[in-house]
Amino acid sequence: MSLYHYFRPAQRSVFGDLMRDMALMERQFAPVCRISPSESSEIVNNDQKFAINLNVSQFKPEDLKINLDGRTLSIQGEQELKTDHGYSKKSFSRVILLPEDVDVGAVASNLSEDGKLSIEAPKKEAVQGRSIPIQQAIVEEKSAE
């Protein structure tokens, strides 16, 4: 690593300053980013069901919303905290396109006491193949009169 840029401030680049400032911000916000809900989510997609499990322990049940529009599942959480000394707001949003073989009419959710949100839907039964017999058309011959 060269110390040339640090001791010659007149020749420092604007982009170098920007990169230094961005790296500083990244280090300062790293603890906040580590607690995001995205790190504690799990998606299960097997032959029997589709399920998503989220850790939403930082949110109250009334702070959560789950919507289903067609096959698009939206999960949102928003919490506001106002005190005499300040204001804090936490939020998250997940949008998931459910697989085509999921029974969207049977989507159900459950929130455990320890803040684990589970959303599950069974898979549709596969349409069984069947053999289709071939019917032969009978053509009547017209006799010449």
UniProtKB/Swiss-Prot annotation:
Please provide one cellular component term from the Gene Ontology annotations of this protein: cytoplasm
Keywords tagged on the record? Stress response
- Regulation: induction: Induced by white light exposure.
- What InterPro entries is this protein classified in? A-crystallin/Hsp20_dom, Alpha-crystallin/HSP_16, Alpha-crystallin/sHSP_animal, HSP20-like_chaperone
Q: Which residues cross the membrane?
A: none
Residue ranges constituting the sHSP domain according to the UniProt record: 32-137
List, alphabetically, the Pfam families matched: HSP20
Query: Which terms does the record give in the GO molecular function aspect?
Result: unfolded protein binding
For this entry, list what GO says about its biological process.
protein refolding; response to heat
The superkingdom listed in its UniProt entry is Eukaryota
Family named by the database record: Belongs to the small heat shock protein (HSP20) family.
The protein here is known as: Heat shock protein hsp-16.2
